Amino acid sequence: MPDRVGLELIATQLGEAIPGSVLETEYFREQAALHVDPAAVRRVLGELRERHGFRALMSVHGVDYYPHEPRLGVHYQLLDMSRVDRIAVKLRVSTDAPRVDSVTPDWPTANHQEREVYDMFGVSFDGHPDLRRILMPEDYEGHPQRRDFPIGGEPVLFTHNDATSPGWTR
């Protein structure tokens, strides 16, 4: 992990290359993170890859910060394999318009991960080549990982288990 000084240096260099992109830095329990403007995430990740050696996108995942606003977050975990360094890039979007640019054109490993964030949290990724649900049925309403999602009620009947699975009733 970059230490505190290294993180601030990276943030400064990113700020020079992409003004206004880095909103805050966070160093907690030896984990370095950059909080970035959602409009700049694709450029920030590209800069981290080309200029700072973070060539592997390990994870894209969603977060719900309910009851705080902006409520929804997307986190990216990058790895520099030559130095075994990790850095997190975090952004937040409101529930009114949860949109962010897709990084799939630059990082193909993000494809299914962005679809999962879309499916579970409802964050749309502009420019994604195939943004549709990946875990839930296409006609499913809601996003199950949001904190205000109602738990309980009727089980979801998937097409492969509607009449054949024991224990499911109609």
Model-identified regions with their sequence ranges:
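Terminal low-complexity/charged segments
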Residues: 1-170
